[in-house]
Amino acid sequence: MLVTDKNYPSEETFFYYGYIYNGDKVTSVEEIKAINGDYCGVLCKDDCVIAVTDPFRSKILYYNIDPEYRTFVFSHDPRDIQHMDLYPYTLEENTIVTLDLHTFKITKQPNMIWDLEQRDQTYTKVFDAANAAIKMRWNPDKDKLMMTSGYDSGVIACCLMNMGYSKFSVTGLGTPPSMAEHQETLAKRLAMHKGHIIKVNGNNYDITPIIEMRNNHNVNEYYGHLLMAVCDWLKTINKDCIVTGNGAFFYDDKGLHGRQFAHYSHFGGAYPKDLNLIFPRQTLRIIQMSGAANLVTLYKGCDHKQPLVDPVLVQAWINTSHKLKNSGYKHWNYAYMKEHDYPFKENFSNGLADDVSRIETFAEKLKIIKEYG
């Protein structure tokens, strides 16, 4: 997707990169706000250009506007803009930006506005929304799930098994000690749905070109190497899309009952009775993760989906009571897997590779992680 003042269409057109699941015939801001998908897009009208990112910036939109020379460029690939000797600015998550083609002034507004009422006492709507989000995104002819021992990929795998799928997952061997998996849980999962294992050899991959696409500090060596290896393997089986649990930090804040387990924890996972105390949520960690995956998959000619930040699912979870949210670590994920008897380790944080109930281990874990990254 590349839209510039030079190739601007003569007719009203909506261009997008990624996936839209509820119709892509978009002609207005109101219709943009109704979109559900993993996408970024540009609506070209006679008098303005309207650009949009989804609520968690599942796809990154880069742009550059020069009001003096009345030029503009929008693209999902930063290299398009770099080749013009321009800097690729990134549009924030959950944002609609309008460029007036008469005045060349820009205005911004939020895409999704969350309903912060916490009224639901069960996870019924959350589970229904999770099933729908995963089902609408899953394409067995193109997709593979990035499998770990954590809660996030576990929920997706559990749902896919309930839908009757097998042989849908892939995982990589060769993790650094600070990112070690809980091997017993992972082995059970791979055995249940016949997951594939690849050996990741970092010597075979160079993430420098990806970093040069756009400086993204979360493209660490191991994660970048893993994604690159999976993309290469996908091509050998005629597939081209990775499905991940990225974004599920939103549901736990890397904390529990007010204890912060990571420096990017906002409120220690202690959800208040009034969500206005913690909203707007700090989503930098989510954006970094999705951004890292997007750059790697884009570079390798593949794609990436994040069903756990589907806006309908997120909204359903927001509407659950604060007591449910505070019932345990990533409690809706826990409850979903427990209901379907899917393997998981209770209170296990894949990102910290340990049991969140053992608070004395976290100082050491955090030190190791900081030293690694």
Model-derived features with residue positions:
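ATP-dependent adenylate-handling active sites, centered on carboxylate activation for C-N bond formation
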Residues: W114-F344, V356-I368
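Acidic, carboxylate-rich catalytic segments that either coordinate divalent cations
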Residues: G373
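Cytosolic regulatory/linker segments at or just downstream of nucleotide-handling modules
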Residues: F348-N350
